[in-house]
Amino acid sequence: MAATTDLIAHGRLIFGIGVGGTRVRGDFRHWGGQNPAIREFEAYGVPLVAPVEGIAALAESCTIIRRMWTEASPFDFDGRFYQLKGAICEPKPRQRPHPPILIGGYGERTLRVITEHADIWNIPGPPFLSVEDFRRKRAVLDEHCAAMGRDPGEITRSVQIFLSGDDPAATRALAAELIDAGVQQVILALQPPVRPAQWVADEVIEPLRAAVPTG
């Protein structure tokens, strides 16, 4: 489906993937105090796995997806979580060698998977993670890249923040701070009630573009 979408979209697909949810323990005060994955997985009848299993399955998935997008001949895969016989993807995506793979996550083990497989690394910004949290996680990612012999500049750093319709200046200030910290892609998430989005361009994007140096 992703390969077909990339063809339909004339090579504009960004393929986002992640663990999706695990039985991780942590601070979920921004989600009402409960791990949101519990309700989501129960709704679809999908078992919620431990973090170590979810991350290992993610790594296998990335390996399989990349091979299906790039290999011309059918292949077998005998993994811990996935076993394939004669797997092949046709038609191939339009982008070569493949669409950019965006992986969301910021845990230690997840960052290792990101180092190995991702073209874009995405995390949530405030109020979930602070700008200083991003700096710390970025340093860990850079260390993993050095250990694996990968140029950290190959991985685009992406952060999602929530737009404030009541205070666009606050959104601009936060985005500018993130860019100064090394974020290359700021994703602006609208919150309900949603009004026509022209204000986002007029009050956030264009003033930010004029204020923040590029290049």
Language-model region placement:
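Active-site-adjacent structural elements that line small-molecule/cofactor binding pockets in enzymes
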Residues: M1-G215
